[in-house]
Swiss-Prot record:
One of its GO terms (biological process) is mRNA splicing, via spliceosome. This is Probable small nuclear ribonucleoprotein-associated protein B. GO terms for cellular component: catalytic step 2 spliceosome; cytoplasm; cytosol; U1 snRNP; U2 snRNP; U2-type prespliceosome; U4 snRNP; U4/U6 x U5 tri-snRNP complex. Plays a role in pre-mRNA splicing as a core component of the spliceosomal U1, U2, U4 and U5 small nuclear ribonucleoproteins (snRNPs), the building blocks of the spliceosome. It comes from Caenorhabditis elegans. The keyword Nucleus applies. The lineage of its organism: Eukaryota, Metazoa, Ecdysozoa, Nematoda, Chromadorea. Keywords: Cytoplasm, mRNA processing, mRNA splicing, Nucleus, Ribonucleoprotein, RNA-binding, Spliceosome. SUPFAM superfamilies: Sm-like ribonucleoproteins. Residues 4-86 form the Sm domain.
Amino acid sequence: MTISKNNKMMAHLNYRMKIILQDGRTFIGFFKAFDKHMNILLAECEEHRQIKPKAGKKTDGEEKRILGLVLVRGEHIVSMTVDGPPPRDDDSVRLAKAGGAGGVGQAKPGGRGMPAMPGMPGMPPGGAPGGLSGAMRGHGGPGMAAMQPGYGGPPGGRPF
């Protein structure tokens, strides 16, 4: 099974990544976003550069700069490798997954009423749940004779 480039990139979101550019610079930061041009957004980014030795010196040094949030143009990227796993947020509040039980402060859709009643597989539920089926005959309200039109006026008063 082949995995598209887009899925590979999505799998590495929030990972600590090391990006090498054409000019030899290296950016290390947390991979936050990308687009169709493979422009990369890195958070808490550091730039590492190799310093060429001056005439007469034998050792070359490395210069490190802390940059913060950086947008790297995809055209200049040579390689991109995983430098570390995504950071763990133990201090943050755990949020319920989508479809979990709602609570105070959580937006949940209203739904479509009561869940389906258990019954035979593939068969519709038998009837309305208790309390939602309507009034029962003979319980409460006037009798059928009182509901017929032309029964008379209001009790104890003259018509308007």
